Swiss-Prot record:
It is found in: Secreted. Changing residue 17 to I: In strain: Showa. GO terms for cellular component: extracellular space. GO terms for molecular function: growth factor activity; hormone activity; insulin-like growth factor receptor binding; protein serine/threonine kinase activator activity. It comes from the Eukaryota. Silk worm has two kinds of PTTH: 4K-PTTH and 22K-PTTH; there are many forms of 4K-PTTH. Pfam families: Insulin. SMART domains: IlGF. This is Bombyxin B-7. Residues 49-67 form a propeptide. Heterodimer of a B chain and an A chain linked by two disulfide bonds. The lineage of its organism: Eukaryota, Metazoa, Ecdysozoa, Arthropoda, Hexapoda. InterPro entries: Bombyxin (IPR017097), Bombyxin_B (IPR027285), Insulin-like (IPR016179), Insulin-like_sf (IPR036438), Insulin_CS (IPR022353), Insulin_family (IPR022352).
Length: 90
C-alpha cells in the first residue's frame, strides 16, 4: 500500500513539473527592458549585458515591424510571451 502511494505521489509531482515547463509565461516588457530583451532575442547577444552593444537603430527598427499593432501594444500594455517577441525579429 505504501509503495503504491509513493509511486502515485511521484507521478503527480513529475506531471506537475512537466506541465509547468510546457507553458510559457507571459510577461510585460516596457521601455529599456523591452528594447534590451528584443536585442538579446533578435541578435543572439548573451544575456549578461551584451544588449547594450546592439546598435540603437537596429533596436528601433524592430520595435514596430509588424504593422499597425506594435510590440509595445502587444507586450507593454499587456503580457506577451517570448514567442511573440521573437515574431518581431527580422
Amino acid at each position: 500500500m505504501m509503495k503504491t502511494s509513493v509511486m502515485l505521489m511521484l507521478v503527480v509531482v513529475i506531471s506537475l513539473m512537466c506541465s509547468g515547463e510546457a507553458q510559457e509565461v507571459a510577461r510585460t516588457y516596457c521601455g529599456r527592458h523591452l528594447a534590451d530583451t528584443l536585442a538579446d532575442l533578435c541578435f543572439g547577444v548573451e544575456k549578461r549585458g551584451g544588449a547594450q552593444y546592439a546598435p540603437y537603430f537596429w533596436t528601433r527598427q524592430y520595435l514596430g515591424s509588424r504593422g499597425k499593432r506594435g510590440v509595445v501594444d502587444e507586450c507593454c500594455f499587456r503580457p506577451c510571451t517570448l514567442d511573440v517577441l521573437l515574431s518581431y525579429c527580422g
